[in-house]
Amino acid sequence: MRELKIGERIPVEAGGEAVVSRELGRGGQGIVYLVRYNGREYALKWYFISRIKNPEAFRNNLRRNIEDGAPEGGKQFIWPLFLTEQKKNGAFGYLMRLAPSGYDSFTDIYNGYKWEKPLAKGRPAIKRKVKFASLDVMIAAALNIVKAFRALHLAGKSYQDLNDGGFFIDTRTGDVLVCDCDNVAPDGDNFGIGGMPGFMAPEVVRGIAKPGVLTDRYSLAVVLFKLFFRGDPLEGSKVLQCVVMTEENDLIHYGRDPVFVYDPNDASNRPVKGVHDNVIKLWQIYPDYIRQAFTLSFTYGIQEPNARIIEKNWIQMLMQLKMDIIHCSCGRTAFLSSFEKTGEHSLVCQNCGSPIYTMSVRDFEMPLYPGAKLYRCVTEKGNDDFETVTGAVIENRLKKGLFGVKNMSRQTWQALYPDHSLREVGP
């Protein structure tokens, strides 16, 4: 493939020409350029045409995705917008919006740092820490990742190449942008893409299945595990015995004989102290239901694709996790399960001795501390809206130190009080 030149004009199917400004980056499928089209700046992905298995089918799928538009209005997706004309040698590309500033790649978040260009020419690159502003923000990011893939799957499409390079995340808010959407295809269709080792479902690694919704769900579990535990769910002592991860070793450890690092029935691939310290430390911190979800995903879920956790169930668990966070007045932030239980609805902070009370809300146990919030998916049965706030713990304006739950929804709640009386709580 001939690389594009600065100032080169690329005809676009929708009319007009995109003018190349500079290169932004390159990967296995092609090169991404900054271009100007119709008075606006876009990113142009220009393909290495020889690396596409069936260019005509791939191009037609891109055109169909452009016509369909991104799921749910496209706010979470860097979606293909315009297709270029094909050159005589068959080369082509597509235009997409630029990722806004303030977002970091999943890879940088996973590594905990990124390298930035120096302010002055000739100076060394600057290493910057990359981490979430809070535990709440990290869980918000996890919810937004799941939400994006739920929207994609509900639209009848699968991502097919889910990996750590597929996301940009605002570490201040948890907002997520899904990129590399050019391989998205209707569930059941595939145009040659397989995925990245470590993220691909074992049946894809073995070559006995094509990527689809069920394999997406395996990859989604990998992404969430990496986000929470900063490690690979299948990389432990067994994998470390391989000096070099060759294609054959990838096939063995991620395809034919994958073993979860915390498989309850197989201890052959446990995390190694000094190498997998993040996984060892963080695995103990998360509540049992989260550990059980990942254990299911990487044991039974490896062998049985239909047993993999669906997006709706991930959202329910992540909402429980979000509500399990306790911000104690002493500054300690931890999950509810980390606090000492002193009664049916009472806990104590081991750090400062402060009492913390909880309240049952449907299937959730909600810690009651100033600023704690309820969400629509919690207060309304059958609803999975995890963004709309429907209630909050507030302090009584007349009696300092007295707290209550304010109904911020449009519905009247039925509340069971400590004296066992059932009362209505209006908005």
Predicted regions, residues:
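Conserved structural core of kinase catalytic domains
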Residues: 78-137
